[in-house]
Amino acid sequence: MNFALKLYHQDKKVNQTLFLYMIYCLTLLLVRAKITQSVYLFFLIWNLFLAFVPYIISSYFQSLDTKNNPKFKLYTLLTIWLLFIPNSFYIITDLVHLDNSDGFIFWLDLIIISSYALIGFGLGLLSLSHFETTLQTIISKKYATITLFCISSLCGFGIYVGRILRYNSWDIISNPFDLIVDLFIAATSKTSLFFSIQFGIFIYFAFLIKKNITSK
């Protein structure tokens, strides 16, 4: 509990906004369930949880004294963060589920999925900001920029693996062999590389826009 409160107060204003927006998103789903008598789209709650994981990790990492913590711990946190950060941006692809909606429900679902995608994307950008702050204490600004673009492209690849290949972060534990084989195939595919780079550019420019707005 103390750990959660510490992270909450670390950036209280932002976390308050995230909390209120999360309540709004959950309320939207409950309203939809009441209207349609269906729990369809409730998978968005799980996707949102996965989007929060890298944000929590990067917030915790930012609170650490990197000079006085074991490198193994720091590298482990960074590895877990890299595995989960694509989940933050992945929710935007859930717009594909609008194909199953029509009439009034289509517009309601558009608002719901867009709301979850917005908070997920925002969490991803905030997490990238945390990473950039830490990164610039280790390497030059030039190399930090290159690294962030590479991570954005890796996020694009992660989205490809999740949306097209239909794997998720937990398959690393539950289905590692098939995952590794399909990752190797995808890594040598022009289609997946194009997909990854395009999503990477999209994420990176969104990050730059957010960065330039908040720096004013």
Predicted regions and their residues:
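N-terminal membrane topogenic signal
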Residues: 3-20
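Membrane-interface helix-boundary motifs at transmembrane edges
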Residues: 7-11, 62-73, 133-143, 216
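Short, hydrophobic transmembrane alpha-helix segments
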Residues: 30-42, 61-66
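Membrane-interface transmembrane-helix boundary segments in multi-pass integral membrane proteins
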Residues: 42, 168, 178-203
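Central hydrophobic cores of alpha-helical transmembrane segments in multi-pass inner-membrane proteins
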Residues: 47-63
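Hydrophobic alpha-helical membrane-insertion segments
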Residues: 78-86, 147-162
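Transmembrane alpha-helical segments in integral membrane proteins
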Residues: 122-135, 197-216
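Juxtamembrane non-transmembrane "cap" segments at the membrane-aqueous interface
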Residues: 156-177
